[in-house]
Amino acid sequence: MTMAKTLYEKVFDAHVVYEGKNELPILYIDRHLIHEVTSPQAFSGLKMAKRRMARADLTLATIDHDVSTKSMDLNACSDMAKEQITTLMQNTKEFGVRLLGLGDKNQGIVHIVGPELGFTLPGVTLVCGDSHTATHGAFGALAFGIGTSEVEHVMATQTLKQAKLKTMKIECKGQFQKGVYTKDLILYLIAQYGTAKGTGYAIEFCGELIRNLSMEARMTLCNMAIEFGAKVGMIAPDEITFEYIKGKEFAPKGEEFQKYCEYWKSLRSDEGAKYDASITLDVSKIKPQISYGTNPSQVIGIDEKIPKISDFKNQSEQKSLLDALYYVNLEQDQVIEGVKIDIVFIGSCTNGRLEDLKIAADILKGRKIHKNVKALIVPGSMQVRKEAENLGLDKIFIEAGCEWRYAGCSMCLGMNDDKANSGQRVASTSNRNFVGRQGKGSITHLMSPASAAACAIEGVICDNRKYLGV
């Protein structure tokens, strides 16, 4: 009798090409995404060893981290950024890798362009030299971030040694309140259990809520599995997945697509499959979530107060709270609603998709942003930008007083020309609120696109639900 397997175990086991005694299994890698920041050293390693790429056709490159979203002009980038971008252009040409370069209609953030081109498919193994590669697990892919030396190894061999992870099931019951989204769900989850709860695990999100989510919403959830401590976040593919993939450039076509769908339907955890850990959440109780500190677990509901030191028994947690509040210039027991905001950033691989922009536009339509707020709307890809413009979303944003940008990582990280100044407070739809993440001395408050749009209007942290008739 065949042993019942989880989704993760099925995909992992199907890709083991060799497993020696007392050795880590070697996995075949189906898809490799690369960008300008973590690929130069890997290409250099290949050149020094006089190697070619094993499967350049299974590699897709894009320019995203360093690019200026103001102009897409290479000359607008810093010297280091310019060098990284031109190096990627040269390397992809030399090794025969498809590059979504500056001016390409499909250029964008690596974790957005992969799915929208059909490069990401259910049941594949997919890696990238970026920690948020778990995003692609929303398709039932086994996707994880790797280091630069591993990037080189995949280029050379199309394989990787990987220890098998433990499995965790997170079942989401119920439905969201109006004004609550998957960004709020993942922030709530991290706040409840901490940033280390998922360490050593491959997470599978399932349940009533998950089945009803769009692919965009599923990607937001899997994207931040890494902030929960997990290496992998997965969702079993279904008809919503298949419909999203159908017709995309790299997706199977015609009868072949139907054959793949039959296989993809088998990519779900078997009845009776054993997980090493499980969590069950009633999502109907979740309210819009806002981060107040300097790690993604320091999060509260919009109507809650910042914790007091007495709320924590652990000395390290107490110190973490005090250090965070000192940095962000907030107080214990302070109400988060009403805290002044300087910049609003709507974008990133977490929330830079068309659905995210629609949510923000619904709130901003017919309204003006606060006179003291600078608001950046940065589509995650040029395809998202075009689709948004076809719907007239760009006009809504511009009329509201926002800056409508080109595609890129932008203010998610202080690596390009979109940075906050020291002491400036950013309402951000990105995934990390570390010290200086958005610029030296910058202060980040993580939230959903709806909450960020509401903050842009009021100039303070506020409840988005007042703009949704709640």
Curated annotation (Swiss-Prot):
Keywords, in A-Z order: 4Fe-4S, Amino-acid biosynthesis, Branched-chain amino acid biosynthesis, Iron, Iron-sulfur, Leucine biosynthesis, Lyase, Metal-binding
Record-given protein name: 3-isopropylmalate dehydratase large subunit
Keyword NAD set for record: no
Keyword Iron belongs to the record: yes
Source organism, top-level taxon: Bacteria
EC numbers: 4.2.1.33
Cofactors demanded by this protein: [4Fe-4S] cluster
Chain sites annotated for binding [4Fe-4S] cluster: C349, C409, C412
CDD domains assigned: IPMI
Gene Ontology biological-process annotations: L-leucine biosynthetic process
Gene name of the encoded protein: leuC
